[in-house]
């Protein structure tokens, strides 16, 4: 009877406890960054019972213990503490040691993602970027992740490889692209292979 993100569900299966994190709620766009609590105005507007939200636990910190049943299914030891969970982009930034204001993680998979850390509570009125509570956020040291997603960038890169010649390696494509003057003589490619994204605002 609770709303869960995938990481919350996995932790629930391991521990038997239904919990979430502030970062998780922010991924679901139901976090009030100014008040530091679930976004009641949004929940009320859509008629969502706040009781559907699980209690929060810290992103880093004790979140429960592996149950005997989960231990039997996974091979983990019963009582093993579960001490961390986060979503894909906060995890990616964490894995790249992007933890402090001004630091940025940029990756290109299916989509192209730029994720920067800020100590400011701001938002984009045109909704071109998402804001997340970052993995190391605390009331004393604000750490928000600002995420720009260009949907389909990786797919567009693969398409360019097919067009430019399948024998080229991606690093060779990058070297060729580096020789092109800024502006590409007016050539534009909108890398939205999966459909338009919000950056078009």
Language-model features, listed with the residues they occupy:
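Short beta-strand to alpha-helix junction loop
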Residues: 32-34, 59-63
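Electropositive nucleic-acid engagement tracts
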Residues: 50
């Amino acid at each position: 009877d609770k709303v869960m993100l995938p990481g919350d569900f996995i932790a629930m299966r391991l521990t038997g406890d239904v919990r979430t994190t502030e970062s998780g709620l922010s991924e679901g766009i139901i976090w009030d960054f100014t008040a530091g609590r679930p976004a009641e105005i949004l929940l009320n507007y859509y008629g969502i019972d706040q009781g559907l939200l699980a209690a929060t636990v810290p992103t880093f910190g004790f979140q429960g213990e592996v149950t005997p049943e989960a231990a039997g299914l996974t091979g983990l030891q019963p009582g093993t503490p579960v001490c961390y969970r986060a979503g894909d982009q906060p995890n990616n930034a964490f894995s790249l040691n992007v933890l402090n204001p001004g630091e940025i993680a940029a990756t290109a998979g299916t989509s192209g993602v730029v994720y920067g850390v800020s100590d400011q509570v701001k938002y984009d009125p045109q909704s071109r970027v998402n804001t997340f509570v970052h993995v190391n956020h605390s009331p004393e040291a604000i750490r928000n992740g600002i995420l720009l997603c260009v949907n389909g960038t990786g797919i567009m890169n693969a398409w360019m490889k097919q067009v430019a010649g399948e024998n080229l390696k991606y690093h060779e494509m990058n070297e060729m692209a580096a020789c092109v003057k800024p502006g590409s003589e007016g050539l534009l490619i909108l890398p939205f292979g999966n459909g338009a994204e919000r950056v078009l605002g």
